[in-house]
Amino acid sequence: MSKWAEGRIVGNRQWTNRLVSLQIAAPEVGFVAGQFARLALPALPGSKESMLGRPYSFVNPPMQAPHEFYFNVLPEGPLSPRLARLNPGEPVWLLDRANGFFTIAELPASEALWCLATGTGLGPYLSMLRTDEPWEKFEHVVLVHAVRFAQDLSYSDVVAALATK
């Protein structure tokens, strides 16, 4: 059975007023690039649950610390605004195992890998493309990141580095 593992915020990057990346130092959470973890904070008073958790995709590759998550802040949401306000040193909880089948191993062999992302959907692709697996499995790798506004083009330095592969 999965348990909550306590981590600490080591970085909080506010890309825009609604796009945030959190870097979290936490006990090892085994995952495959493309998977997601549940992040949580203590539930607010009156809740039936002790923790309020939601799924967020890893942005970092499995061999890189700290864990990184990229998300939209939903102003009226119960969790994302609270996560966005966390400062370095503050606690956050992760479920001790990752989930999801959006991984390179699940893809059939082909000549090209097309990675089409909008907004924060870029996150799992960055996790995958920073491993060797897609570059060994596919002859061509194409990443498309579509956003509404230029200011929402996050991680341009990472994307530029990937373009040199």
Where are these regions (language model features)?
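FNR/FR-type flavoprotein reductase catalytic core
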Residues: 78-165
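Ferredoxin-reductase
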Residues: 2-90
